[in-house]
Every structure is written in C-alpha cells, then in structure tokens.
Amino acid sequence: MTHLALPRFWAHYRSLPEDVQRLADRNYALLRANSFHPSLHFKKIEGRRGLWSVRVGAHHRARATEKPEGIVWFWIGTHAEYDRLLT
C-alpha cells in the first residue's frame, strides 16, 4: 500500500511537539512495514467514504483519504481535534 502526504499534513506535523513528531515517525515506519499492526488502529472511518485514520500514541490521530495512487495523508493532530473534525 502506497502512503503519500500533502503539504498541509506536513504543516500540521511541524506544529506538533517534537516528542509527538518522533512518535509519528516511528508509527509511519510501522505503517509502511505492516499497515494493519494492531497498535496503529489503521482503519476506515465509519460512515465517511474513503477516509482513514491511524493512531499516533494515545492522544493523537492522523487522517487520510483513499485515492487511486494510494492513501493520502492530509491531517495530524490531537484526538480532541480529531473528534471535532468528525462531528
């Protein structure tokens, strides 16, 4: 599975604390090696066609959309922000 990131994803990423950035980097490496590793909770967002999410530690999430070229990451932030985006 191919994973790509939009420039706006990187803008969100750079706004995160460094420890969360390091965790996101480790989780991305795991995602590339095994997309469905249980610790990632990589899954389609129910009721949101073509949207995916992945866990970045206990307090952060990332969102992506499914495109013909692969999974395109466009957002990363806190779990609270993630919940607000889904409502």
Task: Give the location of each predicted region.
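Tryptophan-centered motif/residue detector
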Residues: 10, 28, 52, 73-75
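A short, surface-exposed loop/turn module that caps and links secondary-structure elements
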Residues: 29-54
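Arg/Lys-rich, positively charged N-terminal/basic patches that mediate binding to nucleic acids
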Residues: 1-27
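Residue-level signal for pocket-adjacent positions within structured domains
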Residues: 11, 35-40, 77-80
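Short, charge- and proline-biased low-complexity linear segments
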Residues: 22-31, 80, 84-85
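Enriched for short, Lys/Arg-rich terminal
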Residues: 2-4, 56-87
